Amino acid sequence: GGVTGVYYPTGGAICRMMARTRADHGIRCGAESTGGSVYNVNAVRAGELEFGVAQSDVQFKALNGVDSFKAQGANPKLRSVFSIHPEPFTVVARKDAGIKSFEDLKGKRVNVGNPGSGQRDTMEVLMKKMGWTMADFALASELQAAEQSQALCDNNIDAMVYTVGHPAGSIKE
């Protein structure tokens, strides 16, 4: 994920741990900033990454070839190595936006997440359940996690959604 999320520092911590025993296994590890969960599992499937961090629901969809991974089909070679932390779906709204519930997002300026991110994937699932499309928002922005907090503070969006472990840097902003 992005540098202000939890995946990037988690990847860095894993790489530091791997570096301590590199003489034993010879594996080099580098943390990269990426588009997020969907991007990561697709990059692992394509052989562009050997290891990636992803939301468990995204892993499930990729493994079974359902929802956003239906067109690609199941990926039976995908493996879950370990779980890091829970990632609640979080909605942050401007106090003056009149948003008190998820339903209140309709008709507002909402950052739905960048394509390839777990937050976008989760938001699309929720939108489908609500019977919404992108057209139901006054603005459906596709900012990356690192950009959405500033957009909220600058009054460019009314709300942002984020599937992230807490504490998260961009929400602290």
Where are these regions (language model features)?
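Solvent-exposed coil/turn segments that connect beta secondary-structure elements
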Residues: 49, 56-59, 86, 94-97, ...
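Bilobed "Venus flytrap"/periplasmic-binding protein-like clamshell domains
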Residues: 1-21, 83, 87-154
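Short, solvent-exposed loop/turn and secondary-structure capping segments
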Residues: 8-10, 41, 63-65, 122-124, ...
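N-terminal (or domain-start) structured segment
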Residues: 1-61, 70-71
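A generic structural signal for alpha->beta connector loops
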Residues: 26-28, 75-78, 107, 136-137
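Alpha-to-beta junction loops
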Residues: 25, 45-54, 109-110, 153-162
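Pocket-lining segment of extracytoplasmic ligand-binding domains
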Residues: 56-58, 67, 97, 134-173
